[in-house]
Curated annotation (Swiss-Prot):
The lineage of its organism: Bacteria, Bacillati, Bacillota, Clostridia, Eubacteriales. InterPro entries: PS_Dcarbxylase (IPR003817), PSD-B (IPR033177), PSD_type2_pro (IPR033179). It comes from the Bacteria. It catalyses: a 1,2-diacyl-sn-glycero-3-phospho-L-serine + H(+) = a 1,2-diacyl-sn-glycero-3-phosphoethanolamine + CO2. It is found in: Cell membrane. It is a peripheral membrane protein. GO terms for cellular component: plasma membrane. It comes from Clostridium botulinum (strain Alaska E43 / Type E3). Catalyzes the formation of phosphatidylethanolamine (PtdEtn) from phosphatidylserine (PtdSer). The gene is psd. This is Phosphatidylserine decarboxylase proenzyme. Pathway: Phospholipid metabolism; phosphatidylethanolamine biosynthesis; phosphatidylethanolamine from CDP-diacylglycerol: step 2/2. Pfam families: PS_Dcarbxylase (PF02666). NCBIfam families: PRK00723.1, PS_decarb. The keyword Lyase applies.
């Protein structure tokens, strides 16, 4: 059972995991683990399924998916019948008013919908993946020079489920630099997998860039792919100023993760998020929601 903290009700909720039985089988049984290593983590598996999700035939899955996971389609720009494929539905745009953004320059917002965990005063060589498992920032981005800038800083992990809105956005106004791509595997980023695969974020396909934000310093942004995520699509234009809340990109089908690293003494994360993170619980958040305040 995966429990997440609802910041509004201040209660814990059980996450309705898409493909839960399959995920538990592939990451918790000997046979499943073997299949994962031989097939599921490979690019060809995710590419093949991704191609299917681009077909018109895959659109037949949409109504059941919406019903099973209680997805609110009233906030989507398109009706269910208007999507050409499952991926078209998966990367759906939302009505702008459905995700209000706090324009106060001192407020740090969530870059997307998902479940958030935050660690402060991070040790660059022992960043927490999940309780008991760690990785290093050097391994994650393969750049020693940039890594040192985030010593004792903040690490924000936003885990997206297949049921979530899968576009990610800029948390402040500023100038985004070019994207660096790192090849890797396609393990699931579900907590079940995170408990089973050491240094999973460093094993998976990922992309990173520096965002020169106007209020929170240079933010290191990392997007991590996962099983069935055929593509991480960056839609922004490098070295051109963007406004807070502007779209940065999106993930095609599958669960996936966005990780932000902020320099020391740039932001104070909201107390409820920090407290839940220390207890091992993720907090459910929406794009545009306040998650921290600038340190003045």
């Amino acid at each position: 059972m995966i429990k997440v903290y609802n910041r509004i009700t201040k209660e814990y909720e059980e996450e309705n995991v898409a493909g839960k039985k399959f995920i538990k089988w592939t990451y918790e049984t000997p046979v499943g683990k073997s299949i994962t290593e031989l097939i599921a983590k490979r690019k060809i598996f995710s590419k093949f399924y991704g191609k299917f999700c681009d077909t018109k035939r895959s659109a037949k899955k949409i109504p059941d998916f919406v019903e099973n996971f209680n997805i609110d389609m009233n906030i989507a720009e398109k009706n269910i019948s208007d999507f050409n494929s499952f991926n078209d539905f998966f990367v759906r745009n939302l009505i702008p008013t459905s995700r209000p953004i706090d324009t106060n320059e001192n407020i740090l917002i969530s870059p997307g919908d998902g479940r958030i965990t935050v660690y402060d005063n991070i040790d660059l060589d022992n960043i927490v993946q999940i309780k008991g498992l760690t990785y290093s920032l050097r391994e994650l981005i393969k750049n020693d020079q940039i890594t040192e800038n985030y010593k004792d800083g903040i690490c924000i992990i936003l885990r997206l489920c297949p049921t979530d809105y899968h576009r990610f956005h800029f948390v402040d106004s500023g100038i985004p630099c070019e994207t660096h791509k790192i090849k890797g595997h396609y393990y699931s980023v579900n907590p079940i997998a995170l408990n089973s695969i050491p240094k999973l974020f460093c094993e998976n396909k990922r992309e990173w860039n520096i965002f020169k934000s106007e209020n929170f310093g240079d933010i290191l942004t990392v997007e991590v792919g996962a099983t069935c995520v055929g593509s991480i699509i960056q839609t922004y234009e490098p070295n051109k100023r963007v406004l807070k809340g502007a779209e940065k990109g999106y993930f095609k089908f599958g669960g996936s993760t966005t990780i932000l690293f902020l320099e020391k003494d740039k932001v104070k994360i909201d107390n409820d998020i920090l407290e839940q993170s220390k207890q091992g619980y993720e907090c459910k958040v929406l794009f545009g929601e306040t998650i921290g305040t600038k340190i003045l």
